[in-house]
């Protein structure tokens, strides 16, 4: 494991703070949550939503999206300069669902972006509160990760759909800053870099001139972010090669795909944060809870405690199973789309099933869906235990894994062995060890060959009772190893479409 001493903690990145102590970090994160909560309360007042309507996750998503859109400066500028028919660049909106005469109806609302920005700043003591915005982006990203399998995106960049466990954060906007970069998986970074290199191959001017200089520094920055996720010297050396290339092309794409594959066994460190929908923070704030005073952490017990005491509702389509919808949202809340399902079942206290076995579609409702048949139900977001989120990949281990997803990216710091299908992963590494990265490739392959199935990750770490706030008594779970460990198992999840 690379020494973590030099890195600022993710909370520090999120709080622009130089070195802060734990109490300051907790207060600072709490302040961010307070701001989101106050904003949400104000929006519910503006829209005259009932308490039930305000706790509807679909309304929460619309309100979150409106404020993200209002602060998306690059897109706003683009819309001003390229006006499209019937779209007002100064306005933002979306569907709001109301309960009228025993039925759910959809109402499309439209607000001035300026007005939304005013309400947001007012809720955040006059600040732009970018961290609160990033927090909502990560929540949306985690929801996408649990809902969709990015098969098409993987195939388009020349990767393999079975590498989906590396794709955390693949739908995060570019403007999501350091906190966003921290939660991106190795595959996501590789995909962004490959897209960039491909543009350079197709467009002669991509790396040239004034713009080219900016492009180049963005490229090198992304390479460094990816390098920082790897935990072995050979993988890092390979990233140096890719970064220093004079004219990035197919050789670099090859190296990147190689390093992504290697991350299925030699996992990178990817941060995990429990980011909850705004409709959870709002009611907590309005009930008088002071997050800044009490302190809050995205990686400890706090989100679990908050969800134990929250009522969140969701619209349910006619043939959907509310329990399955709950599982989807629960996984999103804990950033756990790529975690081992056996561990998730243990923590949640109810069986967590693979995506393909769930009778539920995404949380968002499309504008052409019929509202007459919509019901709503309570989402069950409580857990039996809690566990500390990890930002390491755990050490490596092999286990029989499934046909769809062939590795996991751990979310919780809990002792277990990490499943991956070694024979499948290794089959991808035949032959190609020539070229300028040959020694690194050989070294990486050797390390992967030596990964042992009986090794345990996160040794001594366990889950905790919800009454054990100080994490004093770790409970090390025991697993039925015959059970299926992968979420996207031979899967039929919908594709993510922008």
UniProtKB/Swiss-Prot annotation:
A motif (Unconventional nuclear localization signal) lies at residues 1-18. Belongs to the influenza viruses nucleoprotein family. Homomultimerizes to form the nucleocapsid. May bind host exportin-1/XPO1. Binds to viral genomic RNA. Protein-RNA contacts are mediated by a combination of electrostatic interactions between positively charged residues and the phosphate backbone and planar interactions between aromatic side chains and bases. GO terms for cellular component: helical viral capsid; host cell; host cell nucleus; ribonucleoprotein complex; viral nucleocapsid. GO terms for molecular function: RNA binding; structural molecule activity. InterPro entries: Flu_NP. Residues 8-21 have a biased composition (Basic and acidic residues). Residues 1-21 are annotated as: Disordered. Late in virus-infected cells, may be cleaved from a 56-kDa protein to a 53-kDa protein by a cellular caspase. This cleavage might be a marker for the onset of apoptosis in infected cells or have a specific function in virus host interaction. SUPFAM superfamilies: flu NP-like. Keywords: Capsid protein, Helical capsid protein, Host nucleus, Host-virus interaction, Ribonucleoprotein, RNA-binding, Viral nucleoprotein, Viral penetration into host nucleus, Virion, Virus entry into host cell. It comes from Influenza A virus (strain A/Swine/Dandong/9/1983 H3N2). It is found in: Virion; Host nucleus. One of its GO terms (biological process) is viral penetration into host nucleus. It holds the Pfam family Flu_NP. HAMAP family: INFV_NCAP. This is Nucleoprotein. Encapsidates the negative strand viral RNA, protecting it from nucleases. The encapsidated genomic RNA is termed the ribonucleoprotein (RNP) and serves as template for transcription and replication. The RNP needs to be localized in the host nucleus to start an infectious cycle, but is too large to diffuse through the nuclear pore complex. NP comprises at least 2 nuclear localization signals that are responsible for the active RNP import into the nucleus through cellular importin alpha/beta pathway.
């Amino acid at each position: 494991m690379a020494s973590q001493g030099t890195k600022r903690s993710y909370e520090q990145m999120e709080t622009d703070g130089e070195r802060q102590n734990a109490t300051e970090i907790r207060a600072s994160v709490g302040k961010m949550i307070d701001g989101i909560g106050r904003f949400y309360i104000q929006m519910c007042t503006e829209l005259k939503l009932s308490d039930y309507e305000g706790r509807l996750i679909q309304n929460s998503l619309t309100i979150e999206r409106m404020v993200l859109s209002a602060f998306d400066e690059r897109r706003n500028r683009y819309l001003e300069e390229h006006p499209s028919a019937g779209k007002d660049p100064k306005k933002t909106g979306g569907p709001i669902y109301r309960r009228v005469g025993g039925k759910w109806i959809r109402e499309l609302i439209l607000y001035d972006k300026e007005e939304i920005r005013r309400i947001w700043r007012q809720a955040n003591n006059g600040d732009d509160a970018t961290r609160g915005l990033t927090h909502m982006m990560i929540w949306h990203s985690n929801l996408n990760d649990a809902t969709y399998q990015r098969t098409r995106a993987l195939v388009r960049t020349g990767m393999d759909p079975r590498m989906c466990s590396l794709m955390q954060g693949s739908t995060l906007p570019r403007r999501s800053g350091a906190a966003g970069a921290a939660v991106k998986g190795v595959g996501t970074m590789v995909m962004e870099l490959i897209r960039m290199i491909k543009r350079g191959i197709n467009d002669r001017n991509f790396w040239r001139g004034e713009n080219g200089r900016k492009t180049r520094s963005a490229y090198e920055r992304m390479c460094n972010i990816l390098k920082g996720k790897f935990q072995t010297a050979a993988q890092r050396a390979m990233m140096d090669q890719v970064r220093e290339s004079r004219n990035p092309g197919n050789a670099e794409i090859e190296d990147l795909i190689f390093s992504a594959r290697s991350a299925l066994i030699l996992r990178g460190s990817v941060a995990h944060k429990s980011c909850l929908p705004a409709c959870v923070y709002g009611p907590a704030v309005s009930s008088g809870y002071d997050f800044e005073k009490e302190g809050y952490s995205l990686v400890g017990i706090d989100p679990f405690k908050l969800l134990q005491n929250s009522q969140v509702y969701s619209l349910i389509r006619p043939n959907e199973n509310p329990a399955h919808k709950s599982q989807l949202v629960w996984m999103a809340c804990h950033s756990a789309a790529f975690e081992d399902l056996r561990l998730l079942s243990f923590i949640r206290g109810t069986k967590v099933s693979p995506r393909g076995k769930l009778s539920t579609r995404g949380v968002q409702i499309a504008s052409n869906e019929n509202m007459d048949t919509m019901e709503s139900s309570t989402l069950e977001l409580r857990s039996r235990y809690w566990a500390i989120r990890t930002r390491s990949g755990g050490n490596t281990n092999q286990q029989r894994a499934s046909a769809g997803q062939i590795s996991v990216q751990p979310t919780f710091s809990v002792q277990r062995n990490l499943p991956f299908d070694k024979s499948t992963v290794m089959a991808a590494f035949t032959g190609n060890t020539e070229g300028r990265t040959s020694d690194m490739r050989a070294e990486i392959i050797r390390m992967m060959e030596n990964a042992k199935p009986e090794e345990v990750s996160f040794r001594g770490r366990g889950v905790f009772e919800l009454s054990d706030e100080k994490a004093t008594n770790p409970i090390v779970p025991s697993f039925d190893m015959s059970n299926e460990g992968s979420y996207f198992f031979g899967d039929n999840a919908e594709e993510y479409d922008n």
